[in-house]
Amino acid sequence: MIRRIPNDQGIKMKRWGIVPSLVAVLFASFAWADGDHGAHTPKMAAPFWVWAVGLGVLTVVVLILIRQAKRGTLMSERFRGFSRNARLLLIRSPFSGLSVSLIRLLFNLYLLAVGFDMLFVAKFAAINWTCHGLSVIPSGILSDLFGRRRVFLLAYTGNLLATTAIVFVTDPTWLLILAAVIGLFEGGHAIVGPPFMVEQSRPDERVHLFSLNGGIQVGAASLGNLAAGVLPLAFAALFDIGPESAWARRAALMCGLPIMLLSMIPIYLIREEWRPMNIRRWVEGIENYGRIGMLALTEGLVGLGLGFSAPFFNIFFDQHLKASTAQIGLIFALGSILTAMVTLFVPIVVHRLGRVRTVTFVKLLGIPSLILLGMSYDIVWAGAMYVITILLIGGPFPNKGISDPIYTLFAMEVVKERERGTTNGIMHAFVEFPMGIGAALAGPFMAAGDWQTPYMIGGGIFAVAFILYYLYFVRIDGREPVLQPATAS
């Protein structure tokens, strides 16, 4: 029985009415901004009350989304029956999205403020993504054999310690070593979520569960992005230093560390019922080589394409458009909060078009905005293109696109249960390793001031990836539907 949706359009209109106010705040920041950033002098881009209002509005929106998600009222549906482990994974999502978005937005800008050049930043990103890719396949195999919780806790502890170190270390050699260490540990904890969520949910609730998790995570990322813009201003006022200085950005980065620690607690509380798997049985149980191979090829092309642009979106605004940290944070936050809202409605499209058609259509629709972003010389136009790009294509975690939860769910459902950890590890490896290659190739272009070429190359590779994905998987999606209407409780 399909549940009837209550007539609450007025509430929805009020909810969406927040969006124009966010846009107004964004444009206000541009109007007050100092147009001459030639010397990149640290100045507040707008009166402090503008950023306070923006932070307050986005905080309220994110808290409402998280509160409604926990109560199960989003889209007038009640998400009941989730297991305790699934709920713990959902509880972890806001902490994860908040900490990662804050650190990733600020860290590249922090390196530039310390005095490193563009080529060093590109080298750091390339090493980090490459090592991330190298570690996830072994981590996926280990999670299949010994349990996902154990692998996660060990890897996340190492990642937290190494991330703490890079905030204080300024020696270039040690920074590159730590980039590799963080990448290796990140691969260990990145493989836990999707397989575990599939294992802890029913087929008829998975689309909603994955969309809900993605919406909460990206909603929290919006708060992290805005905090990354506001915190340097706050520390600059507190310590009488420039908001674009290395110390202001370092202090803001330190705020992300305790949030990382909090995101680890829900995984520690998970009660995992795991039986060790015999290695020989595991090898013999891998059967879906064709599907796993096609997922790997798609991810490889996606990673290579995104590597030319996505790891450096913040640098694009900082170096090319001379935007302040506060402006970058507000633009990134707007993209994240809109993604969080729209993601929750994607299951409606999936119900009509199917999973593969929905993912392919959304991804291909975002390619023009990515290319136009690389051609932008105006911060307002670039901000609009960035928001559209994040909505449709996405970026590095946690800035995923609106169709990414469905894409991940489909990948977990077309393979066997014993293959899921390994499949997820292979997908991560094939997206992260090529992303490191793309970042290394894009570095010289960006250092020379050429942003258009890498964005165009990345867009072309991305288009090829999802055309191949559609041609292979559209028939499988048609033969094996898993989307079912939610039953009334």
Residue ranges and their predicted role:
Residues 94, 162, 173-189, 300, ...:
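Hydrophobic core of transmembrane alpha-helices in multi-pass small-molecule transporters
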Residues 40-51, 233-257, 444-462:
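A membrane-interface helix-boundary motif in multi-pass transporters
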Residues 188-201, 400-415:
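Intracellular juxtamembrane helix-capping segments at the cytosolic ends
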Residues 136-147, 232, 342-355, 446-447:
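Helix-to-loop junctions at the C-terminal end of transmembrane segments
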Residues 157-170, 365-378:
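C-terminal ends and interior cores of transmembrane alpha-helices
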Residues 72-130, 293-332:
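Helix-loop boundary and gating motifs at the non-cytosolic
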Residues 61-70, 257-276, 468-473:
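C-terminal membrane-cytosol helix-exit motif in multi-pass small-molecule transporters
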